[in-house]
Amino acid sequence: MKRVAFVFTQGPHGNAGGREGLDALLATSALSEDLGVFFIGDGVLQLLPGQQPEKILARNYIATFGVLPLYDVERCYLCQASLQERGLSQVTDWVLDAEVLAPDALGQLLAGYDAVMTF
């Protein structure tokens, strides 16, 4: 089976990218065990705790990221530079356990995947 990476680059709730990416990730997890999940740029905002999307009449799908380990999705990464740019370096209570890596390290990991899906 191919190694598939899912890259989240957009913030939550402004468009359907994050929700659609999560749906695709969950569907793919039933077919493959070799998945990686990367949060880069505004994508790091997907994992912020305490979001209140109902205030803008949006569906709260963020908590679903927290159940990814139940689907054997365990390789999750946050971009260190993206966190710093957004003043989030000190946040530790993400909705999903993810390893914080420098952009170069993320690039090396991504290069090892056969397919990369970006949302």
Swiss-Prot record:
Entries under Gene3D superfamilies matching the protein: DsrEFH-like
Record-linked InterPro entries: DsrEFH-like (IPR027396), Sulphur_relay_DsrE/F-like (IPR003787), Sulphur_relay_TusC (IPR037450), Sulphur_relay_TusC/DsrF (IPR017462)
Localisation per UniProt entry: Cytoplasm
Domain of life: Bacteria
Keywords recorded for this protein, A-Z: Cytoplasm, tRNA processing
Cellular component per GO, a single term: cytoplasm
One GO term (biological process): tRNA processing
SUPFAM superfamilies: DsrEFH-like
Signal peptide residue numbers: none
Keyword Calcium: no
Subunit relationships: Heterohexamer, formed by a dimer of trimers. The hexameric TusBCD complex contains 2 copies each of TusB, TusC and TusD. The TusBCD complex interacts with TusE.
Primary role: Part of a sulfur-relay system required for 2-thiolation of 5-methylaminomethyl-2-thiouridine (mnm(5)s(2)U) at tRNA wobble positions.
Family of this protein: Belongs to the DsrF/TusC family.
UniProt protein name: Protein TusC
Biological source species: Serratia proteamaculans (strain 568)
